[in-house]
């Protein structure tokens, strides 16, 4: 019976289902473009694998596929004890036999055994540093477990630690301090750093600090002298003049008298005595012919010496008369 007998007068063409089943497979959709190629492939398959059963399709579960996930380092919550006990990287886990219900069937498959052998060779042939780094990373992940996500990223040894701030060296002015005590007691100070010709100039400057009871010059051509003030407050004022410039030409230093020198000066003051500052009087002319006394010159007290070079004569006033009687000018 011809195909025209099956057609009805209402429909002049075949149904869509019949057309789909009757249409040949195109070369783009099919695996083989011609029946000859399909026959050759089937003959080759029967020749190689004709004596064995066809391998079953691979069976995978969600637990098995988790090993291939790029997030295999993250702890999963599967109920399978085998999957939790063996946590490896995707590269290593792919080289081992996959644990599935159809394990025996998979091992019997020659294609899967060949694939496992190739992958094991790739893993064994990898460089030693790669395997060591993999092993180190896996052990670190096992040790850390579920720690902080930043662990291993920030290393404490790589942090730059700043040194402690150093104290700024500031020069401090060394101030001469007199031992504390009664401020009304007498106090010795030593003035130094001037030439013998500037003795009067220095002495007049330090008389501005307070009442000077006595002064003791040093040996011949010495650049220092001892000054005794009436109280300690005046001696403190004299110590503050250390490093001061007098008349723009002389810079002097001041320091307290050493305890040993202070004791020797007090003993000489009590035993022999020094010439006190005489009060001003009208008998200055009668006192001038007398030899000028020298105080403790080279250890000898009151050694008379003739007056040397000319001294600068101050103005004729009460202060000048006072200094004339004091120094014998």
Curated annotation (Swiss-Prot):
Q: Does the keyword Heme apply?
A: no
| Annotated region (Disordered), positions in chain | 48-105, 123-167, 271-315
Give the GO terms filed under biological process for this record. Answer: mRNA transport; protein transport
The answer to whether the entry has keyword Protein transport is yes
Q: Which UniProt keywords apply?
A: mRNA transport, Nuclear pore complex, Nucleus, Protein transport, Translocation, Transport
Pfam families cross-referenced by the UniProt entry: RRM_Nup35
Q: Name one GO molecular function term.
A: nucleic acid binding
Q: What is its main location?
A: nucleus
Q: Which SUPFAM superfamilies match?
A: RNA-binding domain, RBD
The annotated regions of Polar residues compositional bias extend over 123-139, 282-306
Q: Name one GO cellular component term.
A: nuclear membrane
Q: According to the lineage, what is the superkingdom?
A: Eukaryota
Which segments constitute the RRM Nup35-type domain? 183-264
Where found? Nucleus, Nuclear pore complex
Instruction: Using the record, list the residue span of the signal peptide; answer none if the entry has no such feature.
Output: none
Q: How does it assemble?
A: Part of the nuclear pore complex (NPC). The NPC has an eight-fold symmetrical structure comprising a central transport channel and two rings, the cytoplasmic and nuclear rings, to which eight filaments are attached. The cytoplasmic filaments have loose ends, while the nuclear filaments are joined in a distal ring, forming a nuclear basket. NPCs are highly dynamic in configuration and composition, and can be devided in 3 subcomplexes, the NUP62 subcomplex, the NUP107-160 subcomplex and the NUP93 subcomplex, containing approximately 30 different nucleoporin proteins.
Family the entry assigns: Belongs to the Nup35 family.
| Entries under PANTHER family matching the protein | NUCLEOPORIN NUP35
Q: What is this protein called?
A: Nuclear pore complex protein NUP35
Organism the protein comes from: Arabidopsis thaliana (Mouse-ear cress)
